[in-house]
Each structure stands twice: as structure tokens, then as C-alpha cells.
């Protein structure tokens, strides 16, 4: 099993959700996060005053999948989230040793 974490632009979340649904991914966890990378925040003017916002709003989407689904899911996320502009985000893939479905106590791939 692997966990895919994707940090994406908020307005791309629905596209990513639909893309994952189309390949059979049935669930995910989504969090509102803030961060910066090469984009390095942005400057705004509010009521005549200029200020810098270092951390930009992003969405963090997490899914845990069987190894056989990971490549297709990562590709679907990239395709759906990509705008071609700076700040599109990142996808991280890491191993998951175990999963337990609390309600049924199923373990491993049966739990995801």
C-alpha cells in the first residue's frame, strides 16, 4: 500500500476528485493548508497599504491505495491539477505499512 499526498491549488480540488473517482478511487481526506515553494507568496494592497502574504492557501489531498492503483492515481492527480503555472503543487508518494478499518477491524488492503 502507498499513500499519495497532493498539495494543489484550491480551485483544482473538484477536478482532482472527479479524476480520481473516474479511476475507481472511492475516498480521500482533504485539508486546507498554507505553504510556499518557489512561488514565495505574493504581495497585496489593502486599503492603500501593501503587505506580503508569505503562505498561500492550498489543499492537501491524501489517499491510501493498493500498490496497483498508485501509478494511475498519481497520473490522474497531476493531469487534473496542472495549470502549467507556478504554484501548481506537488505529489508525494510514500509506503504505508498497515491500515485498519476501525468499524470492521479489517486490515491491509481490505481496509482501504
Model regions: which residues?
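Positively charged, small/polar-rich N-terminal and surface patches that mediate targeting and assembly
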Residues: 1-112
Amino acid at each position: 500500500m502507498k499513500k499519495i499526498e497532493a498539495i494543489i491549488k484550491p480551485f483544482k480540488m473538484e477536478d482532482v476528485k472527479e479524476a480520481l473517482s473516474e479511476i475507481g478511487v472511492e475516498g480521500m481526506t482533504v485539508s486546507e493548508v498554507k505553504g510556499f515553494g518557489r512561488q514565495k507568496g505574493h504581495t497585496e494592497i489593502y486599503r492603500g497599504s501593501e503587505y506580503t502574504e508569505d503562505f498561500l492557501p492550498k489543499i492537501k489531498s491524501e489517499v491510501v491505495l493498493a500498490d496497483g492503483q498508485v501509478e494511475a492515481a498519481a497520473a490522474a492527480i497531476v493531469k487534473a491539477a496542472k495549470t502549467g503555472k507556478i504554484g501548481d503543487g506537488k505529489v508525494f508518494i510514500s509506503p504505508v505499512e498497515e491500515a485498519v478499518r476501525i468499524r470492521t477491524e479489517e486490515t491491509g488492503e481490505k481496509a482501504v
